Amino acid sequence: MGSRIRENDKSELYKPLIPTSITPVISNHSLISIRLFYTAYFAAMGLILPYFPVYLTDLGLNTLWVGVFIGALAATKIIAPPLAGLLLEYRDTNTRTFLLFTAGLATLASALFIPQFDMGWMLTIVIVFGFFWAAILPLTDGLSLVVSEISMMSYGRLRVWGSVGFVFASFLGGLWLVGDNISLFPWILTTLLILTTIAATGFPDLSNIDTKQKQQASAQTNQKALLWLLFIGFCMQASHGAYYGFFSLYMLDAGYSGGEIGLFWVIGVLAEIVLMWYWSKRIQKASPAWVLGICLLLASLRWFGLAITTNIAAIIVLQLLHAASFAAFHLSAVAWVRKFAKPHRQTSAQGWYSSIGFGLGSTVGIMLCGIIVETQGYSAAFYACTFIALLGLLAVWKLQQHFREAA
């Protein structure tokens, strides 16, 4: 997977997409608002990923139905991100206004996760919530990439605040959301989403950056490489199916307490934080074949390790690999989506990356693992995820071929 990248091609990734004549001033208030948004949004995710399955189990669902509900939540990420991107590209829609609208509706839906359980009602609310919740993140990431270019601040150092929020929510959730306290889950979630809506009011207005001006500052595109990159993103996210859907239940079954499970999640995200803070720009400049290939290899080792052992020391070491399987992979992928996509399709390209990876990949992975867990057990699900990560590693070879053609 070695790469030979001409310096002028390599520098295209950081060639400004925004002409200096229309570059707006980004205030400290806007930067603080973006950090607060990421913190609250991912704090909500830090509750949903580890504890929503536990909440559903407490309501009486078996593991198969937990997989259906979590898969339905992930499935909304297939439609919402590209649809939101297309709306912003084809209509004169203000990003900040659209983000406020979607954040407000996601908050309203989360308040309807009421304890009185009715399967049809609950599934409908989960789908509505997931749709608006999924539309928010790729738009915010796109906005943050623009802001990072304008303000010369690393995207990773904006995005890292989401990891901080995830850490606190995962750890505190493990302490609070135990036993009967799991009924507090929907109310804590709603509070965090209210904070995301408040933070979105402080986002900068970038409406003066229009499509033609972006086109004039465009880099050469590579659509075939983009398609392979999207498939690789699908494989990586699908390989997380057992982890995001059933890791907490797996650890409960192995005898760990809620606090210990929360700590396991925290260890993974702490590794993610360190990588994002210190190596964000270096990773984004490196060849995608090298970075994504190494990340997929380490992901396969991570899932294989979880399949064969629940030893506490091994779990701690394996959780450190989250820095590769999520953080390094994400930083590289969003940067190369930006390089390979058509300049006037930047927003929808990020939406498609989110849709195919976090949406379709997560849906397939979680629902497949739900079936495997119900019939074969937790270890078998992690073996399956190992295979999926290795499949993505094979696809990196095709990406490298197209990357060399472009270079």
Identify the meaning behind each predicted range.
Residues 26-74, 226-264, 330:
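Helix-loop boundary and gating motifs at the non-cytosolic
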Residues 80-93, 177-178, 274-287, 373:
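Helix-to-loop junctions at the C-terminal end of transmembrane segments
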Residues 184-202, 381-398:
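Symmetry-related core transmembrane helices of the 12-TM Major Facilitator Superfamily/SLC fold
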Residues 97-111, 290-305:
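Structural signature of the two symmetry-related core transmembrane helices
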Residues 56-57, 87-88, 160, 175-180, ...:
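Interfacial helix-cap and linker-helix signal at transmembrane-aqueous boundaries
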Residues 39, 109, 119-137, 234, ...:
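Hydrophobic core of transmembrane alpha-helices in multi-pass small-molecule transporters
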Residues 22-28, 203-237:
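Juxtamembrane intracellular "pre-TM" segments in multi-pass secondary transporters
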Residues 127-161:
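Cytoplasmic helix-loop-helix junction between adjacent transmembrane helices
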